[in-house]
Amino acid sequence: MSDQKDQMIDITVDFSGGLEILFSNQKHHALSVPAQDAQGKPANVGFLINYLCQTLMTDPRADLFVLGGELRPGILCLINDCDWELEEEDAYVLQPGDNILFISTLHGG
């Protein structure tokens, strides 16, 4: 029997609007992420954002994606094609097969 702490969830994460530059210039990522955070709570989108910064981000400019540990204003997050504001935002608990899309609306000028 496998330990619940070792369980993983298979999801896809996509980046658009220039965010892919922060993640090896790759727009689509098929990931297996821990099913629980360090406190043993079910992994949610807030956990995923931190996880992406720690494990997938290759660019040192994390502030282009997060500010103060939260998703930077101007970045849209869609959970299974729905605005995350309709899905409890960063409290949404990840489910196997979820597709999380981050889109930057920030533009230089």
UniProtKB/Swiss-Prot annotation:
Pathway: tRNA modification; 5-methoxycarbonylmethyl-2-thiouridine-tRNA biosynthesis. The modification 1-thioglycine is found at residue 109. GO terms for cellular component: cytosol; nucleus. There is a cross-link at residue 109 (Glycyl lysine isopeptide (Gly-Lys) (interchain with K-? in acceptor proteins)). Its main location: cytoplasm. One of its GO terms (molecular function) is protein tag activity. SUPFAM superfamilies: MoaD/ThiS. One of its GO terms (biological process) is tRNA wobble uridine modification. Acts as a sulfur carrier required for 2-thiolation of mcm(5)S(2)U at tRNA wobble positions of cytosolic tRNA(Lys), tRNA(Glu) and tRNA(Gln). Serves as sulfur donor in tRNA 2-thiolation reaction by being thiocarboxylated (-COSH) at its C-terminus by the MOCS3 homolog nit-1/uba4. The sulfur is then transferred to tRNA to form 2-thiolation of mcm(5)S(2)U. Prior mcm(5) tRNA modification by the elongator complex is required for 2-thiolation. Also acts as a ubiquitin-like protein (UBL) that is covalently conjugated via an isopeptide bond to lysine residues of target proteins such as ahp1. PANTHER family: RURM1 PROTEIN (PTHR14986). This is Ubiquitin-related modifier 1. It comes from Neurospora crassa (strain ATCC 24698 / 74-OR23-1A / CBS 708.71 / DSM 1257 / FGSC 987).
